């Protein structure tokens, strides 16, 4: 058996079951394990309880149980500067950002990685469901997690091979029920803790209320593309393309079909709505994306056919990717039209099991027509 006792792994511990089991597994495998809790947001829930304090208590219980040292590090300034200002800027532009992708790139795998290296780490480890594979020359490839329901490569798609050389994903070969079982058998305090949902590090806040603290809402007209006014919207930032809930207009007429958000006009402050899940205004034939990041330096050529996801947990779609002349932008053409392409979200590229990288969606098109989504 390999002796890992001289290999230090710093585990990003959130107070959840996944990162708890990561620390447990690495400790069982004989690594020199250190737990670190990242506090990235000054947070209290609606009952006035600081959720970060509660999570840190869980980290302490787990670390004490498995016998590892643990620390807390405050990244609030880095999070504000690198993630949250980006998040607000995107909403101001009428887009729907994905802060988790940026949070991983800038905080968990940059600020935290740097901090861990200062602690003498050889590697960092997190509770992400993803796998790594390395070539003989050290190039790292990012692969989907075995648990297809939990695979998190979508959120890791802006990391590069050099960063991943210093990373471990011990849960990549596991499925969630087995992770919980391990935690229960080991008597970990987090074994039955529910998974967190919501924005990276901000948790389960009322999103509308939360966003309203930082950006003034400007109500405006809610109307159809042919000019029928259907009501008033609360502020364009609260709506995303394809959304059904929260519009306050029920189905009407004989068909009684529900209404959906089918467009936005930031300049005129209009929210466009249309009837039917398959409303033609919701379908795009291609998109343009920029802010491109690929995991490896492999030359993919100017055109390549792969699959892509346009949001987390969506089924892959076949696409052809075409680079512009200076490789700063791609046009992604879909094998079949895709519903509710959303500017600000990530388009993530896959070749089979491998996550190749991603870009941020700037605009969606139906043939030559740009869709009015911002």
From Swiss-Prot:
Q: Which domain of life is it from?
A: Bacteria
Q: What is its EC number?
A: 2.8.1.13
* Reaction equation(s) it catalyzes: S-sulfanyl-L-cysteinyl-[protein] + uridine(34) in tRNA + AH2 + ATP = 2-thiouridine(34) in tRNA + L-cysteinyl-[protein] + A + AMP + diphosphate + H(+)
Report residues binding ATP: 12-19, 38, 127
Cellular component terms, GO, for this chain's entry? cytoplasm
Give the positions the UniProt entry annotates as the active site. Answer: 103, 200
Q: Flavoprotein: is it a keyword of this entry?
A: no
* Site location (Interaction with tRNA): 128, 345
Q: Outline what the protein does.
A: Catalyzes the 2-thiolation of uridine at the wobble position (U34) of tRNA, leading to the formation of s(2)U34.
Question: What protein does this entry describe?
Answer: tRNA-specific 2-thiouridylase MnmA
Classification lineage: Bacteria, Bacillati, Bacillota, Bacilli, Lactobacillales
Gene coding for it: mnmA
